[in-house]
Amino acid sequence: KVGFLAPTLQTEFMIGIDEKLHEECDNRGWDYVSASFDNDSAAAVSAIENMVTGNCNYIVAMVSDTSCDDALRAAQEKGVKIIECGVETAVHDLVLKTDQYSIGTQIGDMAADWLNSQLGGEGNIVVYTTYQNQDMQDRGQGIQDAIKEKAPNVNILEVVDIGKDVVGSGTTTTETMLQKYSNLNGIVCYGDAAAVESVEAVKAAGKDNENFGVFACDGTNQALKGINDGTCMRGTMYFEALGSVVAKYIQELVDGKTFDAAIETPIHAVTKANIADYYKADK
């Protein structure tokens, strides 16, 4: 039995992982349960304990820090295999991770390339990040550093903490930014959920034109559709289907394989130039 512990199950990215992992487990005849801790460490600990009492053999934990280590260690001591996804702490049997700062620089590189080609290396942007966990803070810093390096004449007008997976924050923040900065040319977000909301706010303000760009990360279907349809959504980082990737490695654990080193999960930059490789209109 597999348990999936997610920071939220309200965003398209996390819902997609949950649904795909559930499907993969069903295909293998494994029982499956998922829970969201809504970025609350106490809720995460409770969910882990419930998965142990619910006879989970494997827990896929997308924790954001070390606050769950004791609960994960207690689960491990009862024979549960721990798969950490995204963040590496001291307690795990397998880690699937990404270099969050590197992801940030890749998002920033996409934005800088567009700013250089479309606006001659000039322009005014805002960056949406969050300081609620170290990973997203690192990603946000990578965004800023890459833009400063590759498009040094672009003005980063403001770096905004929009919270972690807060539904609606992209909309309200973008409405504020558009009112505050009439000369805004772009928004660079740590994740697609806020970016997709931002695109809609930009459209509503009548600024969805060739000189406005939104960039983010996750490769959600909504973000890919925005790129494909020619909106101001210009680029996203695409994670290969994480549900399938996780299931593949759980199968290897089932088969007795052990892992000494973390596994880097594959990720790809997607823009208008290669959108056809990642998005099909009938999805």
Regions found by a protein language model. Name each.
Residues 1-283:
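A residue-level marker of the well-folded mature domains of exported/periplasmic proteins
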